[in-house]
Amino acid sequence: MVKEEKQENRGSVEFQVFSFTNKIRRLASHLELHKKDFSSERGLRRLLGKRQRLLAYLAKKNRVRYKKLISQLDIREK
């Protein structure tokens, strides 16, 4: 029963990138309304950096998983 509830691996690179992408999109829409919210902008930049480092790691380790992930999340390749 516990294994059924925990289908996704929350520690996987894909799940972490997915989570960061959701947070980034939410913060970006917030910043469109609140242009002078500089602390949220700083948080957005930190999340972008974390996601970029994870994607670089995944690209180095497994290029196929990397390509599949960026196509699913509609992220530009750097």
Curated annotation (Swiss-Prot):
Pfam families: Ribosomal_S15 (PF00312). One of its GO terms (cellular component) is ribonucleoprotein complex. One of its GO terms (biological process) is translation. The keyword rRNA-binding does not apply. Gene3D superfamilies: S15/NS1, RNA-binding. It is found in: Plastid, Chloroplast. PROSITE patterns: RIBOSOMAL_S15. One of its GO terms (molecular function) is structural constituent of ribosome. Keywords: Chloroplast, Plastid, Ribonucleoprotein, Ribosomal protein. Belongs to the universal ribosomal protein uS15 family. HAMAP family: Ribosomal_uS15_B (MF_01343_B). Part of the 30S ribosomal subunit. This is Small ribosomal subunit protein uS15c. It comes from Sorghum bicolor (Sorghum). The lineage of its organism: Eukaryota, Viridiplantae, Streptophyta, Embryophyta, Tracheophyta. The gene is rps15-A.
